[in-house]
Protein backbone atom coordinates (compact mmCIF):
# COMPACT_ATOMS: atom_id res chain seq x y z
CA UNK A 1 0.00 0.00 0.00
CA UNK A 2 1.32 3.41 -1.01
CA UNK A 3 -0.21 6.63 0.25
CA UNK A 4 0.33 10.12 -1.07
CA UNK A 5 2.14 12.65 1.16
CA UNK A 6 -1.18 14.35 1.81
CA UNK A 7 -2.79 11.09 2.89
CA UNK A 8 0.19 10.22 5.06
CA UNK A 9 -0.09 13.63 6.69
CA UNK A 10 -3.78 13.05 7.36
CA UNK A 11 -3.01 9.70 8.99
CA UNK A 12 -0.25 11.25 11.09
CA UNK A 13 -2.63 13.94 12.26
CA UNK A 14 -5.15 11.31 13.33
CA UNK A 15 -2.40 9.36 15.10
CA UNK A 16 -1.45 12.42 17.14
CA UNK A 17 -5.12 13.02 17.94
CA UNK A 18 -5.48 9.44 19.23
CA UNK A 19 -2.30 9.64 21.31
CA UNK A 20 -3.41 12.92 22.87
CA UNK A 21 -6.87 11.66 23.77
CA UNK A 22 -6.16 7.98 24.52
CA UNK A 23 -7.19 8.23 28.17
CA UNK A 24 -9.70 11.08 27.87
CA UNK A 25 -12.74 8.93 28.48
CA UNK A 26 -14.65 9.57 31.66
CA UNK A 27 -18.23 9.68 30.37
CA UNK A 28 -18.40 6.41 28.43
CA UNK A 29 -17.65 2.82 29.51
CA UNK A 30 -14.53 1.99 27.51
CA UNK A 31 -11.34 0.79 29.19
CA UNK A 32 -8.25 2.17 27.46
CA UNK A 33 -5.44 0.46 29.38
CA UNK A 34 -4.93 -2.46 27.01
CA UNK A 35 -1.87 -3.63 25.12
CA UNK A 36 -2.33 -6.03 22.23
CA UNK A 37 1.10 -5.45 20.69
CA UNK A 38 1.72 -9.22 20.68
CA UNK A 39 -1.13 -9.52 18.18
CA UNK A 40 0.01 -6.81 15.73
CA UNK A 41 1.67 -9.34 13.43
CA UNK A 42 -1.70 -11.03 12.79
CA UNK A 43 -3.06 -7.92 11.08
CA UNK A 44 -1.41 -9.05 7.85
CA UNK A 45 -3.90 -11.93 7.65
CA UNK A 46 -7.56 -11.99 6.66
CA UNK A 47 -8.78 -13.93 9.68
CA UNK A 48 -12.46 -14.71 9.26
CA UNK A 49 -14.54 -16.82 11.63
CA UNK A 50 -16.95 -17.68 8.87
CA UNK A 51 -20.30 -19.03 10.13
CA UNK A 52 -18.78 -21.52 12.54
CA UNK A 53 -17.80 -21.01 16.16
CA UNK A 54 -15.50 -22.67 18.62
CA UNK A 55 -18.02 -25.50 18.70
CA UNK A 56 -18.10 -26.15 14.95
CA UNK A 57 -15.53 -25.15 12.35
CA UNK A 58 -16.10 -24.14 8.74
CA UNK A 59 -13.70 -25.04 5.91
CA UNK A 60 -12.17 -21.54 5.80
CA UNK A 61 -8.63 -22.11 7.05
CA UNK A 62 -7.62 -18.69 8.42
CA UNK A 63 -9.90 -18.66 11.43
CA UNK A 64 -9.43 -18.16 15.17
CA UNK A 65 -12.00 -20.72 16.30
CA UNK A 66 -9.59 -22.38 18.74
CA UNK A 67 -9.16 -19.07 20.56
CA UNK A 68 -12.87 -18.30 20.39
CA UNK A 69 -13.60 -21.67 22.00
CA UNK A 70 -11.30 -20.76 24.90
CA UNK A 71 -13.09 -17.42 25.27
CA UNK A 72 -16.52 -19.03 25.37
CA UNK A 73 -15.32 -21.68 27.81
CA UNK A 74 -14.22 -18.85 30.10
CA UNK A 75 -17.59 -17.10 29.92
CA UNK A 76 -19.58 -20.30 30.35
CA UNK A 77 -17.79 -20.80 33.66
CA UNK A 78 -18.14 -17.12 34.55
CA UNK A 79 -21.91 -17.24 34.06
CA UNK A 80 -22.46 -20.62 35.73
CA UNK A 81 -23.51 -22.85 32.87
CA UNK A 82 -21.95 -26.16 31.88
CA UNK A 83 -19.99 -25.82 28.65
CA UNK A 84 -21.87 -28.69 27.03
CA UNK A 85 -25.17 -26.95 27.82
CA UNK A 86 -24.06 -23.56 26.48
CA UNK A 87 -23.58 -22.06 23.04
CA UNK A 88 -22.10 -18.69 22.22
CA UNK A 89 -19.73 -16.65 20.10
CA UNK A 90 -17.75 -13.41 19.90
CA UNK A 91 -20.01 -10.67 18.54
CA UNK A 92 -19.50 -7.21 17.07
CA UNK A 93 -20.77 -5.66 20.30
CA UNK A 94 -23.62 -5.48 22.77
CA UNK A 95 -26.33 -4.72 20.22
CA UNK A 96 -25.64 -7.93 18.30
CA UNK A 97 -25.66 -9.88 21.55
CA UNK A 98 -29.00 -8.37 22.53
CA UNK A 99 -30.42 -9.05 19.09
CA UNK A 100 -29.29 -12.67 19.33
CA UNK A 101 -31.00 -13.09 22.71
CA UNK A 102 -34.22 -11.50 21.47
CA UNK A 103 -34.05 -13.62 18.31
CA UNK A 104 -33.91 -16.79 20.39
CA UNK A 105 -36.82 -15.56 22.49
CA UNK A 106 -38.90 -14.79 19.43
CA UNK A 107 -38.16 -18.16 17.83
CA UNK A 108 -39.19 -19.90 21.05
CA UNK A 109 -42.34 -17.78 21.41
CA UNK A 110 -43.20 -16.30 17.96
CA UNK A 111 -46.27 -14.49 19.29
CA UNK A 112 -44.68 -13.38 22.56
CA UNK A 113 -44.31 -9.75 23.64
CA UNK A 114 -40.92 -8.27 24.55
CA UNK A 115 -40.96 -6.31 27.81
CA UNK A 116 -38.17 -3.89 28.68
CA UNK A 117 -37.75 -0.91 30.99
CA UNK A 118 -37.57 2.66 29.74
CA UNK A 119 -33.94 2.73 30.93
CA UNK A 120 -33.00 -0.03 28.49
CA UNK A 121 -30.31 0.69 25.89
CA UNK A 122 -31.60 2.49 22.80
CA UNK A 123 -30.67 -0.46 20.56
CA UNK A 124 -33.76 -2.35 21.72
CA UNK A 125 -35.87 -0.06 19.51
CA UNK A 126 -33.89 -1.18 16.45
CA UNK A 127 -34.06 -4.81 17.49
CA UNK A 128 -37.84 -4.94 17.82
CA UNK A 129 -38.20 -3.35 14.37
CA UNK A 130 -35.75 -5.71 12.72
CA UNK A 131 -37.20 -8.81 14.38
CA UNK A 132 -40.79 -7.54 14.21
CA UNK A 133 -41.47 -8.44 17.83
CA UNK A 134 -44.43 -7.08 19.74
CA UNK A 135 -43.07 -4.93 22.53
CA UNK A 136 -44.01 -2.95 25.61
CA UNK A 137 -41.92 -0.36 27.43
CA UNK A 138 -42.15 -0.64 31.21
CA UNK A 139 -41.72 2.20 33.70
CA UNK A 140 -38.48 2.47 35.66
CA UNK A 141 -37.95 3.04 39.37
CA UNK A 142 -36.07 6.20 40.43
CA UNK A 143 -32.74 4.32 40.46
CA UNK A 144 -33.23 3.09 36.88
CA UNK A 145 -34.34 -0.42 37.83
CA UNK A 146 -37.42 -1.87 36.14
CA UNK A 147 -40.72 -1.21 37.90
CA UNK A 148 -41.84 -4.74 38.76
CA UNK A 149 -45.42 -3.70 39.51
CA UNK A 150 -45.74 -1.98 36.14
CA UNK A 151 -44.13 -4.98 34.41
CA UNK A 152 -46.72 -7.35 35.85
CA UNK A 153 -49.56 -4.90 35.25
CA UNK A 154 -48.66 -4.71 31.56
CA UNK A 155 -48.22 -8.48 31.21
CA UNK A 156 -51.62 -8.98 32.87
CA UNK A 157 -53.30 -6.30 30.76
CA UNK A 158 -51.87 -7.86 27.60
CA UNK A 159 -52.97 -11.33 28.74
CA UNK A 160 -49.50 -12.39 27.64
CA UNK A 161 -48.81 -16.05 28.40
CA UNK A 162 -45.33 -16.13 26.85
CA UNK A 163 -43.52 -12.91 27.78
CA UNK A 164 -39.98 -12.28 26.56
CA UNK A 165 -38.20 -10.35 29.31
CA UNK A 166 -35.29 -8.04 28.50
CA UNK A 167 -33.50 -7.58 31.83
CA UNK A 168 -30.78 -5.00 32.37
CA UNK A 169 -27.71 -6.03 34.32
CA UNK A 170 -26.48 -2.45 34.48
CA UNK A 171 -28.46 0.21 32.61
CA UNK A 172 -26.72 2.65 30.29
CA UNK A 173 -27.28 5.91 32.17
CA UNK A 174 -27.70 4.86 35.80
CA UNK A 175 -26.02 1.47 36.08
CA UNK A 176 -29.18 -0.10 37.50
CA UNK A 177 -29.72 -3.85 37.72
CA UNK A 178 -33.10 -5.47 37.19
CA UNK A 179 -33.51 -8.21 39.80
CA UNK A 180 -34.01 -11.34 37.72
CA UNK A 181 -34.97 -13.38 40.78
CA UNK A 182 -37.74 -10.91 41.64
CA UNK A 183 -38.94 -10.99 38.02
CA UNK A 184 -39.18 -14.78 38.10
CA UNK A 185 -40.98 -14.75 41.45
CA UNK A 186 -43.54 -12.24 40.18
CA UNK A 187 -44.14 -14.27 37.03
CA UNK A 188 -44.61 -17.41 39.10
CA UNK A 189 -47.10 -15.61 41.34
CA UNK A 190 -49.00 -14.62 38.19
CA UNK A 191 -49.26 -18.29 37.22
CA UNK A 192 -46.73 -18.17 34.37
CA UNK A 193 -44.55 -21.29 34.49
CA UNK A 194 -40.79 -21.01 33.96
CA UNK A 195 -40.92 -22.83 30.63
CA UNK A 196 -43.48 -20.34 29.32
CA UNK A 197 -41.26 -17.26 29.14
CA UNK A 198 -37.79 -16.22 27.98
CA UNK A 199 -35.34 -14.15 30.04
CA UNK A 200 -32.45 -12.34 28.34
CA UNK A 201 -29.85 -10.37 30.32
CA UNK A 202 -28.05 -7.34 28.88
CA UNK A 203 -24.84 -7.26 30.93
CA UNK A 204 -22.81 -5.11 28.54
CA UNK A 205 -20.80 -3.43 31.31
CA UNK A 206 -21.66 -5.21 34.56
CA UNK A 207 -21.14 -8.68 33.13
CA UNK A 208 -17.42 -8.20 33.84
CA UNK A 209 -18.06 -6.67 37.27
CA UNK A 210 -20.56 -8.84 39.15
CA UNK A 211 -18.63 -12.14 38.88
CA UNK A 212 -15.71 -10.53 40.72
CA UNK A 213 -17.43 -8.84 43.67
CA UNK A 214 -18.18 -10.32 47.08
CA UNK A 215 -21.93 -9.76 47.06
CA UNK A 216 -23.26 -9.70 43.47
CA UNK A 217 -26.87 -9.26 42.51
CA UNK A 218 -28.37 -12.19 40.52
CA UNK A 219 -26.93 -12.27 37.00
CA UNK A 220 -26.13 -15.81 35.84
CA UNK A 221 -27.69 -18.94 34.38
CA UNK A 222 -27.75 -20.35 37.91
CA UNK A 223 -30.05 -17.41 38.74
CA UNK A 224 -32.43 -18.28 35.90
CA UNK A 225 -31.42 -16.42 32.73
CA UNK A 226 -31.74 -17.94 29.24
CA UNK A 227 -29.08 -15.80 27.53
CA UNK A 228 -26.63 -13.05 28.35
CA UNK A 229 -24.38 -10.64 26.44
CA UNK A 230 -21.31 -8.65 27.48
CA UNK A 231 -19.29 -6.01 25.64
CA UNK A 232 -15.59 -6.68 25.11
CA UNK A 233 -14.51 -3.07 24.65
CA UNK A 234 -15.96 -1.85 27.95
CA UNK A 235 -14.53 -3.40 31.13
CA UNK A 236 -12.09 -5.66 29.26
CA UNK A 237 -10.90 -3.10 26.71
CA UNK A 238 -10.32 -3.50 22.99
CA UNK A 239 -9.31 -1.31 20.02
CA UNK A 240 -12.20 -2.84 18.09
CA UNK A 241 -15.77 -2.91 19.45
CA UNK A 242 -16.78 -6.48 20.23
CA UNK A 243 -18.58 -8.63 22.76
CA UNK A 244 -19.81 -12.10 23.57
CA UNK A 245 -23.18 -13.77 23.85
CA UNK A 246 -23.92 -17.00 25.71
CA UNK A 247 -27.19 -18.92 25.50
CA UNK A 248 -28.63 -22.31 26.33
CA UNK A 249 -27.64 -24.76 23.63
CA UNK A 250 -31.10 -26.31 23.31
CA UNK A 251 -32.60 -22.89 22.45
CA UNK A 252 -29.96 -22.21 19.79
CA UNK A 253 -30.59 -25.45 17.93
CA UNK A 254 -33.91 -24.17 16.57
CA UNK A 255 -32.21 -21.35 14.58
CA UNK A 256 -29.48 -23.51 13.01
CA UNK A 257 -29.19 -23.42 9.20
CA UNK A 258 -26.83 -25.72 7.30
CA UNK A 259 -24.65 -24.08 4.61
CA UNK A 260 -23.21 -26.81 2.41
CA UNK A 261 -20.41 -24.90 0.63
CA UNK A 262 -19.00 -23.70 3.96
CA UNK A 263 -19.51 -27.11 5.56
CA UNK A 264 -20.92 -25.57 8.70
CA UNK A 265 -24.18 -24.73 10.41
CA UNK A 266 -24.96 -21.03 10.74
CA UNK A 267 -26.37 -19.97 14.09
CA UNK A 268 -24.88 -16.47 14.29
CA UNK A 269 -26.41 -13.09 13.38
CA UNK A 270 -23.65 -12.23 10.91
CA UNK A 271 -21.99 -14.60 8.44
CA UNK A 272 -18.39 -13.49 8.12
CA UNK A 273 -17.17 -12.54 11.58
CA UNK A 274 -14.09 -10.68 12.74
CA UNK A 275 -11.41 -13.26 13.53
CA UNK A 276 -9.16 -10.73 15.26
CA UNK A 277 -11.46 -9.84 18.14
CA UNK A 278 -11.53 -13.42 19.51
CA UNK A 279 -7.72 -13.21 19.61
CA UNK A 280 -7.96 -9.97 21.57
CA UNK A 281 -10.53 -11.32 24.01
CA UNK A 282 -8.44 -14.44 24.47
CA UNK A 283 -5.26 -12.44 25.14
CA UNK A 284 -7.04 -10.13 27.60
CA UNK A 285 -8.64 -12.95 29.56
CA UNK A 286 -5.36 -14.88 29.70
CA UNK A 287 -3.40 -11.82 30.82
CA UNK A 288 -5.14 -11.45 34.18
CA UNK A 289 -5.65 -14.00 36.93
CA UNK A 290 -8.91 -14.20 38.85
CA UNK A 291 -7.31 -12.24 41.70
CA UNK A 292 -6.09 -9.58 39.26
CA UNK A 293 -9.56 -9.17 37.76
CA UNK A 294 -10.96 -8.77 41.27
CA UNK A 295 -8.35 -6.11 41.96
CA UNK A 296 -9.20 -4.20 38.76
CA UNK A 297 -12.91 -4.31 39.56
CA UNK A 298 -12.38 -3.25 43.18
CA UNK A 299 -10.21 -0.34 42.06
CA UNK A 300 -12.96 0.82 39.68
CA UNK A 301 -15.67 0.50 42.34
CA UNK A 302 -13.54 2.29 44.94
CA UNK A 303 -12.89 5.10 42.47
CA UNK A 304 -16.63 5.41 41.80
CA UNK A 305 -17.34 5.67 45.52
CA UNK A 306 -14.58 8.27 45.84
CA UNK A 307 -16.34 10.36 43.19
CA UNK A 308 -19.69 10.04 44.98
CA UNK A 309 -18.14 11.04 48.30
CA UNK A 310 -16.37 14.07 46.78
CA UNK A 311 -19.53 15.25 45.04
CA UNK A 312 -21.68 14.84 48.15
CA UNK A 313 -19.12 16.55 50.39
CA UNK A 314 -19.52 19.61 48.16
CA UNK A 315 -23.31 19.52 48.22
CA UNK A 316 -23.80 17.87 44.82
CA UNK A 317 -26.50 15.17 44.77
CA UNK A 318 -24.44 12.32 43.27
CA UNK A 319 -25.10 8.62 43.74
CA UNK A 320 -24.51 5.17 42.28
CA UNK A 321 -26.23 1.81 42.37
CA UNK A 322 -24.73 -1.09 44.30
CA UNK A 323 -21.79 -2.74 42.49
CA UNK A 324 -21.91 -0.06 39.79
CA UNK A 325 -19.07 2.09 38.46
CA UNK A 326 -21.58 4.56 37.00
CA UNK A 327 -21.80 7.75 39.08
CA UNK A 328 -24.94 9.82 38.44
CA UNK A 329 -25.04 13.57 39.13
CA UNK A 330 -27.06 16.63 38.03
CA UNK A 331 -26.41 17.64 34.45
CA UNK A 332 -23.80 20.41 34.29
CA UNK A 333 -23.54 23.10 31.63
CA UNK A 334 -23.04 22.24 27.99
CA UNK A 335 -19.51 23.60 28.27
CA UNK A 336 -18.51 21.11 30.96
CA UNK A 337 -20.37 18.23 29.32
CA UNK A 338 -18.55 18.88 26.05
CA UNK A 339 -15.14 19.40 27.66
CA UNK A 340 -15.30 16.05 29.50
CA UNK A 341 -17.30 14.15 26.84
CA UNK A 342 -20.07 13.39 29.31
CA UNK A 343 -23.14 11.38 28.41
CA UNK A 344 -26.23 13.33 29.47
CA UNK A 345 -29.92 12.47 29.50
CA UNK A 346 -32.59 14.83 30.75
CA UNK A 347 -31.42 16.40 33.99
CA UNK A 348 -28.73 13.79 34.67
CA UNK A 349 -25.17 13.11 33.62
CA UNK A 350 -22.80 10.36 34.60
CA UNK A 351 -19.14 9.52 34.85
CA UNK A 352 -17.85 5.95 34.59
CA UNK A 353 -14.74 4.79 36.41
CA UNK A 354 -13.31 2.17 34.06
CA UNK A 355 -9.91 0.63 34.98
CA UNK A 356 -7.75 3.01 32.95
CA UNK A 357 -8.30 5.68 35.60
CA UNK A 358 -5.20 4.72 37.55
CA UNK A 359 -5.52 7.90 39.62
CA UNK A 360 -8.28 10.42 40.31
CA UNK A 361 -6.80 13.44 38.53
CA UNK A 362 -9.38 13.59 35.73
CA UNK A 363 -12.23 12.84 38.12
CA UNK A 364 -11.04 15.56 40.49
CA UNK A 365 -10.78 18.06 37.64
CA UNK A 366 -14.35 17.31 36.53
CA UNK A 367 -15.76 17.47 40.05
CA UNK A 368 -13.93 20.74 40.75
CA UNK A 369 -15.53 22.35 37.70
CA UNK A 370 -19.00 20.96 38.45
CA UNK A 371 -18.81 22.16 42.06
CA UNK A 372 -17.50 25.60 41.08
CA UNK A 373 -20.27 26.00 38.53
CA UNK A 374 -22.92 24.90 41.03
CA UNK A 375 -21.62 27.37 43.62
CA UNK A 376 -21.64 30.19 41.08
CA UNK A 377 -25.20 29.32 40.04
CA UNK A 378 -26.26 29.29 43.69
CA UNK A 379 -24.66 32.70 44.25
CA UNK A 380 -26.41 34.12 41.20
CA UNK A 381 -29.74 32.71 42.35
CA UNK A 382 -29.33 34.25 45.82
CA UNK A 383 -28.38 37.59 44.30
CA UNK A 384 -31.36 37.51 41.95
CA UNK A 385 -33.67 36.59 44.84
CA UNK A 386 -32.30 39.43 46.96
CA UNK A 387 -32.74 41.97 44.15
CA UNK A 388 -36.29 40.75 43.52
CA UNK A 389 -37.11 41.03 47.22
CA UNK A 390 -35.80 44.61 47.33
CA UNK A 391 -37.87 45.58 44.29
CA UNK A 392 -41.02 44.06 45.79
CA UNK A 393 -40.52 46.00 49.03
CA UNK A 394 -40.16 49.40 47.31
CA UNK A 395 -43.28 51.59 47.47
CA UNK A 396 -45.27 51.63 44.28
CA UNK A 397 -44.39 54.57 41.97
CA UNK A 398 -47.06 57.26 42.06
CA UNK A 399 -45.98 59.15 39.02
CA UNK A 400 -46.62 58.75 35.31
CA UNK A 401 -43.45 57.68 33.51
CA UNK A 402 -44.33 59.56 30.33
CA UNK A 403 -44.99 62.90 32.03
CA UNK A 404 -42.17 62.76 34.55
CA UNK A 405 -39.34 61.58 32.29
Swiss-Prot record:
InterPro entries: Group_II_Decarboxylase, Hist_deCOase_bac, PyrdxlP-dep_de-COase, PyrdxlP-dep_Trfase, PyrdxlP-dep_Trfase_major, Pyridoxal-P_BS. Its EC number is 4.1.1.22. Coiled coil: none annotated. Substrate binds at residue 121. Homotetramer. GO terms for molecular function: histidine decarboxylase activity; pyridoxal phosphate binding. The keyword Lyase applies. Keywords: Decarboxylase, Lyase, Pyridoxal phosphate. Pathway: Siderophore biosynthesis; pseudomonine biosynthesis. It comes from Pseudomonas fluorescens. This is Histidine decarboxylase.
